[in-house]
């Protein structure tokens, strides 16, 4: 029970006792303690102060059914009572204790009560159960702070339990834990393999204020089971165990030393390897990316074994009756590790003539020896003459047979200027009659009527092959004296020499390229020994061509895809049937992952596994807008298992990068040492990259019903993508209404919106229920759907309506757009717009030998000889690469045997359409190579 008031008699008695006690204090003490409350006029009459709490009741928690005790102390205090939830506690429930303070002499009163679980549970309302002390003295009352009494508990389930994870070595790991609800709030500690984590001892661990565990830098020793433990005065709870695995990604060891050249003589390969052991993958870490070995072309000087010269004449007979003869080991001298001559350097034998004084023979014996020696000499001389005559006869017979066999195939061209300039042009032309014979004048025009001198096969100089063009300061195109070029003609060559369609090369002999059937037989024999993939035969998405050491170009018409095989890329004497194939995306695992987008067709060039002596150049179109620097561009290749692997990230090349990419505005030229399947992908740094698209509208060629469909295709801005849509619509009976329009599509997560407007409602109506259609952003950006389109279905009220005018608007939400103003006829004789009509003449797929290149071989050779050697002034191949804008990563060219040759090959690939040699001439002139200045011009139709 609680009391509502305090008895008056008890209060009066307490007041009198306090006054008597105060009168016993010394005046000095009383003055110090009560100077702030008594007036200055009564310093000798002290008064009792307000009660001061020495101990106030604390918050308490009831565990199970055990009551809690609340205690308070105060002085000076005549009475102390508890007040709980605004009501006085019954006097009988108080336990009071009194004592006198030894220092102050004041009475210290202590009061104690108990609060049970039942009292707390009987309280209704939102406020917790509370109690406070009220103390009295003669000066008045003082209240203590409130203490709250709550029933303690701890729920069983955690609000959030830690989850196991895998973390890379030395990376940060976060384990989250939200303990169960409880009163008082639970304290949290973490266990690692059942041992408490002390973050003060191991500073690699951090326990945050919200009870999360952070591993700052994961160590292998941190691989363990982690448990979050929550506890308070009631109970202790454990979370489920979270397993943390610290994994190690594999790292490459250092490269080994280059192995010796595998060929003791001539061209070969050097190899070096590395292992994925620095560190080795651990606990599920990834294997190393990149090549495990590298190859490097080498050229070892062939060893020359020594050979003896002829014996010298015998020396005069000495007094010891001995004469000598000698020989030298210099025919040839041993070089490059060749063997020394074996045998004797000096030879001696006994003699009896000369100064020899022993065993004099009679004159008759001497004469007989002389006659015998004379007979031997005559015999040997006769044999030598007979052998010489036989050799002459055999040579004469061989020459006669050779001339008879080659009478229909040989033509000698003695004009060196015509031979040289003929290398510049794929057809014959009339030479300019100017005095300066070492320049090619820009006024030279192709002679389309002349047939003499047209190149139809291999070109051979009849001079010694060892007579190479030296590095000189003389003009590059000096007249070549008495140069003869042997040209093999063939009666089966067509009107375009050196140019063949890919279908003619599948199993058929490439006429006009190889002079005899023996070479083709050799080619078939060589190819039969190669372990190559089967060539594709689907002419709709592949082209093929047969190439030898003279190289050539394989072009996929109307797709922007081509393969340039430089001269010397294929080993001498071998011929390969090579192919290009555009893979259908619906049948191929896509190379893009995450936020990456496909930027080019997926191209397979083969056969794979070819041993190439020089890099080939694969040209593929792309649809990235490279005017912005927000792209991360990658070239990927597909392994035999079908997985895509990164070959190179542009601008992150290293010496181990196996290829080089020359990026142009609409295409990429890739120098490859290995043939295979390749694709170009990209993603943006900050979601501002732009992808070029094409919008094409198709309508049915013939419409006999009231419904009329307009299809709006959204494809990548590459020729092959539009070509695929054109072929698809042709099979469906559709035609292209007007020229496709470009659209810049930004990586902004906004969809592509299409709408139709200005329909003549008196004749037509739209069956589209909404105001517009949308293509989701990811469908467009990913590039996975090649024939992405929307269809607008219109209905005419009568078959008499044969014309339709309307507008179609295509735009990216909050981005760019295009508007098509359409006017189409539904009559039968409609003409489809053909975007490739201007390129119809470029349907040639294969160019062989010199016809594939703009720079003649002799001029190319002289440029390489002049620029390959490093120059202290810097005007060597490095400056040429800079002038031609091919200097993004010069270390790639530096690893090649002829850096200039690779740069010129890349220039050929970049200028396959224009063939403007003036750019090369200007670059050489700016380099200060005045002796190489060329006046180059190409006239004629593209």
UniProtKB/Swiss-Prot annotation:
The chain crosses the membrane at residues 381-401. SMART domains: DEATH (SM00005), IG (SM00409), IGc2 (SM00408), TSP1 (SM00209), ZU5 (SM00218). Keywords: Cell membrane, Developmental protein, Disulfide bond, Glycoprotein, Immunoglobulin domain, Membrane, Receptor, Repeat, Signal, Transmembrane, Transmembrane helix. Disulfide bonds join 72-133, 84-131, 177-228, 261-298, 265-302, 276-288, 317-351, 321-356, 329-341. Residues 249-303, 305-357 form the TSP type-1 domain. The keyword Endoplasmic reticulum does not apply. CDD domains: Death_UNC5B (cd08802). Residues 31-380 are extracellular. GO terms for biological process: anterior/posterior axon guidance. Residues 150-245 form the Ig-like C2-type domain. Residues 402-942 are cytoplasmic. It is a single-pass type I membrane protein. It is found in: Cell membrane. Residues 687-835 are annotated as: UPA domain. It comes from the Eukaryota. Belongs to the unc-5 family. Plays a role in cell-cell adhesion during embryonic development. Receptor for netrin required for axon guidance. Mediates axon repulsion of neuronal growth cones in the developing nervous system upon ligand binding. Interacts (via extracellular domain) with flrt3 (via extracellular domain). Interacts with rnd1. This is Netrin receptor UNC5B-b. It comes from Xenopus laevis.
